[in-house]
Curated annotation (Swiss-Prot):
Primary localization class, coarse: endoplasmic reticulum
Protein name (database record): Lactase-like protein
Key words, A-Z: Endoplasmic reticulum, Glycoprotein, Membrane, Sensory transduction, Signal, Transmembrane, Transmembrane helix, Vision
GO molecular function, one term: hydrolase activity, hydrolyzing O-glycosyl compounds
Bilayer disposition of the protein: Single-pass membrane protein
Annotated signal peptide: 1-21
Lineage: Eukaryota, Metazoa, Chordata, Craniata, Vertebrata
Function recorded in the entry: Plays a role in formation of the lens suture in the eye, which is important for normal optical properties of the lens.
Species this chain originates from: Homo sapiens (Human)
Length: 567
């Protein structure tokens, strides 16, 4: 083990005991607040095109960077899985609409596949009419069920040809191609879609796609690639917003925003100024990286200071963080009609008191250490702990930091245990109860929260984790070619929250929990019978036709023998 890693490990071991001692939960954090959400509050669930649709090469769709990434070799995705079929959502629209109605949601957040609409990524070259028809039919089906579509333009599945020709988001020309794609979507669907999201979690898209290489396109341009990609994504967002504002807003009366994911960063020791600064730095490098240019016109000052200083220490003449011109700052500032927030968990943050020897990177630029409390409930994914109070703090931070914007929670949820096939997900119920209640407290604090999207409708392809992490309200049996869906206990619980528009009283809320667990036992029996049903299906589809063919053959032989005897 290298000396620097020994020092890191010892430092973290010394910090862990401080977590419980330095911070004690306030009565306000521990208490449950019974009450309802404002009238008109919108409840929903979400998904994304690449994770659920399948049909990766059907009806004129072009390849995406994720198609190529998952097809190009072993070790990139757990189990070497692909999303070629995924949930088969392309062919199961009506079935999934029934699930949405069963949940009683007000809205459904989904993404459009850029390469399904524009196979080469460039509008001037080719528009896929079948792609237009597919999404148009989906939108109509939602509206006919009184479900509002909230549409994401880009959720990570960039057309592969744009990556090959131009280097993807490393090239500023992507901003114009994205604007053209956005205009196509506004033109085709804007008469019915009134809530648009330009990008979903662009921070992860930039960091994992252009720094760590864990996501498509798999580039490892450490310390530079992610900042350049983010710079161009922010410009692309602004161009799409201005196009809508100039050309479409007066006709369509819709809203355009962006969805940014961020965990809450809590200082290990609130009496230590260094920890307070580190926690603030964590939030600015996470949320402020994209939100600050959109709401204030430029990157957070702490990002410019830290990356600039480290770039100089590394012998570079210019900062690795790109610079916006004065004209660009003015153009980008104010380009959001609402702030979309995604949030899953919390980290304790402390300053890093030792030098990093790993070279330039996003992680090293921040000069901080992330920790978790060993007492926090550990959920399915290794990174995901249930810490509801962090949600309220993030919502209040965003509210004050960015000038009281309308906020839509666009992602919040918990993953299933690894390869778990149980439908009694009571731990997810506890997660939902805690996090939604903290959101209610944030509204009580004064946060202008308009809606909540739980992640996600279905179990689906989870990027480099394949199908191992299950976030869905509905369990999907991926080993069955029909991809059947089964409701988990959390379906019943979330539905009750939606119908009641919150948590009316202790007795009623407790009854929801008991009812949810009762129904899941029946659903588990259905799921347990699935192997037998699959076997029966195999018998029906393979054995029976084979036997029939043999019967026909034997009959023909007997008939020939009979004819020979008669002759």
């Amino acid at each position: 083990m290298k000396p620097v890693w020994v020092a890191t490990l010892l430092w973290m071991l010394l910090l862990v005991p401080r977590l419980g001692a330095a911070r004690k939960g306030s009565p306000e954090e521990a208490s449950f607040y019974y009450g309802t959400f404002p009238l008109g509050f919108s409840w929903g669930v979400g998904s994304s095109a690449y994770q659920t649709e399948g049909a990766w090469d059907q009806d004129g769709k072009g390849p995406s960077i994720w198609d190529v990434f998952t097809h190009s070799g072993k070790g990139k995705v757990l189990g070497n899985e692909t999303a070629d079929v995924a949930c088969d959502g392309y062919y199961k629209v009506q079935e999934d609409i029934i699930l949405l109605r069963e949940l009683h949601v007000n809205h459904y957040r989904f993404s459009l596949s850029w390469p399904r609409l524009l196979p080469t990524g460039i509008r001037a070259e080719q528009v896929n009419k079948k792609g237009i028809e597919f999404y148009s039919d989906l939108i109509d089906a939602l509206l006919s069920s009184n479900i509002t579509p909230i549409v994401t333009l880009h959720h990570w599945d960039l057309p592969q040809l744009l990556q090959v020709k131009y280097g993807g988001w490393q090239n500023v020309s992507m901003a114009n191609y994205f604007r053209d794609y956005a205009n196509l979507c506004f033109e085709a669907f804007g008469d019915r879609v009134k809530h648009w999201i330009t990008f979903s979690d662009p921070r992860a898209m930039a960091e994992k796609g252009y720094e760590t290489g864990h996501h498509a396109p798999g580039l490892k341009l450490r310390g530079t690639g992610l900042y350049k990609a983010a710079h161009h994504i922010i410009k692309a967002h602004a161009k799409a917003w201005h196009s809508y504002n100039t050309t479409w807003r007066s006709k369509q009366q819709g809203l355009v925003g962006i969805s940014l994911n961020c965990d809450w960063g809590e200082p290990v020791d609130i009496s230590n100024p260094k920890d307070l600064e580190a926690a603030e730095r964590y939030l600015q490098f996470c949320l402020g990286w994209f939100a600050n240019p959109i709401y204030a016109g430029d990157y957070p000052q702490v990002m410019k200071d830290y990356i600039g200083r480290k770039s100089a220490e590394q012998g570079l003449e210019m900062s690795r963080l790109p610079v916006f011109s004065l004209q660009e700052k003015s153009y980008i500032k104010g380009t959001s009609d609402f702030l979309g927030l995604g949030h899953f968990t919390t980290r304790y943050i402390t300053e890093r008191n030792y030098p990093s020897r790993q070279g330039p990177s996003y992680q090293n630029d921040r000069d901080l250490i992330e920790l978790v409390d060993p007492n926090w409930p550990d959920l399915g994914s290794k990174w995901l702990y249930s810490v509801p109070w962090g949600f309220r703090r993030l919502l209040n931070f965003a509210q004050t930091q960015y000038g009281d914007p309308p906020i839509y929670v666009m992602e919040n949820g918990a993953s299933q245990k690894f390869h778990c096939t149980q439908l009694c997900d009571e731990w997810r119920i506890q997660y939902l109860k805690g996090y939604i209640n903290e959101m209610l407290k944030a509204i009580k604090d004064g946060a202008n929260i308009k809606g909540y999207t739980s992640w996600s409708l279905l179990d689906k392809f989870e990027w480099e984790k394949g199908y191992s992490d299950r976030y869905g309200f509905y369990y999907v049996e991926f080993n069955d070619r029909n991809k059947p869906r089964y409701p988990k206990a959390s379906v019943q619980y979330y539905k009750k929250i939606i119908i009641a528009n919150g948590f009316p009283n202790p007795r009623e809320v407790e009854s929801w929990y008991l009812k949810a667990l009762e129904t899941c036992s029946i659903n588990n029996q259905m799921l347990a019978a699935e192997p037998l049903l699959s076997h029966m299906q195999m018998v029906t589809e393979i054995v029976v036709p084979t036997v029939c063919s043999l019967c026909v053959l034997i009959t023909a032989v007997l008939l020939m023998l009979l004819l020979r005897r008669q002759s």
